[in-house]
Amino acid sequence: EVIVGYKINSLGDVDSIAACFEVDFKIFIHWNDPAFVGKEKGPVKKGSSKLDPKVECMNARKLVTYSEECALKNPSTGALKHSMYCRGTMSMLAMDLYMFPFDCQNLQIGVKPNKKDIHDVVLIAGGECSINSFPRNEWQCHGHICRSYHTDPTNSSTGKIYSSLHIILLMERESGWYVK
């Protein structure tokens, strides 16, 4: 079981035609590794945990990871925290143009473990899940939520089930951008 939290710092440049948006965010991944029980609290070398879920963004178009750090948070349980600070362009996973330009969009950041099936990693939303208040430019944020999903084994060449987590931001276009 892997707990995933997030903090959205900013969001903008929603492009309904190119089906993408710009986002600045942090992802926090928490898991326990018994191999770290009794070790010294503090920074941990990346990749040193055999149970590292190796979480990645599945709808990244041009995403840059500016910093990554992993730390042992609780030596008595082997609790580890991996933090990633990312900024860039994400593809829209779902888009509705029914009321364009008077539209709302569910902008999503999808995360999944790299090549680890549900027997190894199950992603669960938890911990810090927040969005900074940022200037209401063209879009206004009405809320955010996290949802866990599992793939259909019939769509997999190996018949495996994979876990994923979607951070969903409900955005509405400000009326000043389409009413003159």
Question: Language-model segments: which ranges?
Answer:
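Non-transmembrane, solvent-exposed beta-strand/loop segments in proteins
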Residues: 1-180
